[in-house]
Amino acid sequence: MTVVPVKLNELKNKLVIIDQTLLPNEEKFLELDNPEEIWEAIKKLRVRGAPAIGIAAAFGLYVSTLKSKAANVAQFKKEFEEVRDYFATSRPTAVNLFWALKRMTRRFEQEEDKTVDKIKQALLDESEKIFAEDQEMSKAIGKHGLSLLKPGMGLLTHCNAGGLASSGYGTALAPIYLGHEKGYNFKVYADETRPLLQGARLTTYELYKAGIDVTLICDDMASLVMKEGKIDAVLVGCDRVAANGDTANKIGTSGLAVLAKEYGIPMYILGPTSTIDLDASTGEDIKIELRDEEEVVNGFGRRTALKGVKAYNPAFDVTDAKYITAIITEKGIVMQPYKESLKKLFE
Ligand code: MRU
């Protein structure tokens, strides 16, 4: 993945993102430094995918408050908290957003006895750390994930959990990139991922450009390709993993997991430990984002149902832990019983 989808500009005073709503047809980079633009970019999925949302929020919080003219730390803190709380309203499901905002807050509090300028410097340092750690995490996830795969395998993925959803290497696609470097010749099937087509627009874009064998399928073809024996493993990312292993990911993931179980295909969830939320005991505690009905009936400029027809548009679903073969993090591979194995990751 050559494009870094979320980063700071050279002067380190603007957030730079590739506008993912325009892909694959146009590669347009946006430079943002005000909270409203950054909030809008997250909300509208110009930057999306759990790890990338966290990085955008951290860099966004830094660049938004960098311009502050606050005369003292108390005033600066008030401004910082206002932007932080505003960003927290952008998208509810991916816990990485809240995780990154919490990390930035903790760092602020550690430096609170310093000058405003020193605190700004510390916020830059923390956001750059979040970015750098994400790159390392992706590579480690790739390594652990690859240990479960064999050359020539057929792999099914859903939505986009690749470089575009992170700092440039991805989660579910990380083992695929690593395997590609080692000549594994995977055959990747990418679900289109209705309604916003992250699979069609983003996953095939990045895998095709990387020279990886990728075939696009409509979401409703997953069962068929499994039955035809084309799929040896399902690899998906995650937006929030509860303490018992229940996992929120892009709408449609839970259906794939049920199918995979029926056909005896392993279902792997890949994500950094920042996506694990031990405060959520089960999937019931995960807030699922409901998005505009227009995305379903009028997604890409053409109305597909009569005006007035109701549409339901939850952006995520929760896969019950019982359908998940393993959760692959940068710290290693965990299996059932997830309540114990996930907890151990944080000890
Ligand atoms: O609505 P999106 O595009 O932000 O949803 C993204 C997903 O569901 C991804 O699968 C998930 O964030 C994992 S990204 C490594």
Curated annotation (Swiss-Prot):
Gene Ontology process terms (BP): L-methionine salvage from methylthioadenosine; pentose catabolic process
EC numbers for this chain: 5.3.1.-
SUPFAM superfamilies, sorted: NagB/RpiA/CoA transferase-like (SSF100950)
Gene3D superfamilies: translation initiation factor eif-2b, domain 1, Translation initiation factor eif-2b, domain 2
GO molecular function annotations of the record: S-methyl-5-thioribose-1-phosphate isomerase activity
Binding site for substrate: R48, G49, A50, R91, Q198, N249, K250
Pathway stated in the Swiss-Prot or TrEMBL entry: Carbohydrate degradation
Active-site residues annotated for this sequence: D239 (proton donor)
Lineage: Bacteria, Thermotogati, Thermotogota, Thermotogae, Petrotogales
Broad enzyme group: isomerase
Keyword Isomerase appears in the UniProt entry: yes
Site (Transition state stabilizer): C159
Protein name in the entry: 5-deoxyribose 1-phosphate isomerase
Domain of life, per lineage: Bacteria
Species this protein is from: Petrotoga mobilis (strain DSM 10674 / SJ95)
Keywords, comma-separated and alphabetical: Carbohydrate metabolism, Isomerase
Segments traversing the membrane: none
